[in-house]
Amino acid sequence: MRISVYACFLGLYFLVFSLIVYVILGAEFLVSVLQPGNVARSMLWVLPAYVANASPVVFSRLVRKRWRLHPMDFGLTFVDGQRLLGDNKTFEGFLGGMLSGVLVGILLAYARFVDGVSAFLLPLGALLGDLGGAFVKRRLRIKPGEPAILLDQLDFVAGALILQGLFSKLPAAEVVVAVVLLTPIVHLLTNMAAFVLGLKDVPW
């Protein structure tokens, strides 16, 4: 898939989601969501999840230079004959993502952008959500590295928000909406940067 087409789909998502928020919650709420202060607060709050989601590919590349990686599905297949998760979801990557996300979470908790519980829940939820997304992609016969628009961008955020909501409390509605609205765009931009730097094989 061409990156320009991918970006167009995400732009369309932004417009449609914004319209839905406008219709349901009103113009004033949408304006408050997109205020720079709220955007900055939202990105800082979700940063542990972002870091946890982005780190596994880096850790896996570092580890596989000297050691063998261990896939989390142990090479097992589902009833459809396809792998449960695939070789790209490894214990090393999961551990690296968790450690990185928690470290960032602790720093943000020290600065009082998140609480101590969120410093753990957000990275763990993001990684579990990413595994759930990988499971769905394998069922759809989408190979590792191939794009699945919106699923790739929102699976880890959904996992982080769900785990946070189950075991702690979610932030203000404006923060949650900003995270869901802006994450696909942030995800694409950071992945493009990682691709340019040689950290990823594909720009999505």
Swiss-Prot record:
- This enzyme's EC code(s): 2.7.7.67
Give me the segments passing through the membrane. 5-25, 43-63, 91-111, 116-136, 147-167, 175-195
Keyword check for Lipid biosynthesis: yes
Kindly list the cofactors needed.
Mg(2+)
Q: Name one Pfam family in it.
A: CarS-like
Membrane topology label: Multi-pass membrane protein
List the record's Gene Ontology CC terms alphabetically: plasma membrane
Sorted UniProt keywords: Cell membrane, Lipid biosynthesis, Lipid metabolism, Magnesium, Membrane, Phospholipid biosynthesis, Phospholipid metabolism, Transferase, Transmembrane, Transmembrane helix
- Per the record, what are the reactions this protein catalyses? 2,3-bis-O-(geranylgeranyl)-sn-glycerol 1-phosphate + CTP + H(+) = CDP-2,3-bis-O-(geranylgeranyl)-sn-glycerol + diphosphate
* Any GO BP: glycerophospholipid biosynthetic process
| Pathway(s) | Membrane lipid metabolism; glycerophospholipid metabolism
- Say yes or no: keyword Transmembrane helix present: yes
InterPro entries attached to this UniProt entry: CarS, CarS_archaea
Enumerate the subcellular locations listed in this protein's record, separating them with semicolons: Cell membrane
GO MF terms listed in the record are: CDP-2,3-bis-(O-geranylgeranyl)-sn-glycerol synthase activity
The record ties this protein, via HAMAP family, to: CDP_archaeol_synth
Q: What the protein does?
A: Catalyzes the formation of CDP-2,3-bis-(O-geranylgeranyl)-sn-glycerol (CDP-archaeol) from 2,3-bis-(O-geranylgeranyl)-sn-glycerol 1-phosphate (DGGGP) and CTP. This reaction is the third ether-bond-formation step in the biosynthesis of archaeal membrane lipids.
Similarity-based family: Belongs to the CDP-archaeol synthase family.
Q: What is this protein called?
A: CDP-archaeol synthase
Organism of derivation: Thermofilum pendens (strain DSM 2475 / Hrk 5)
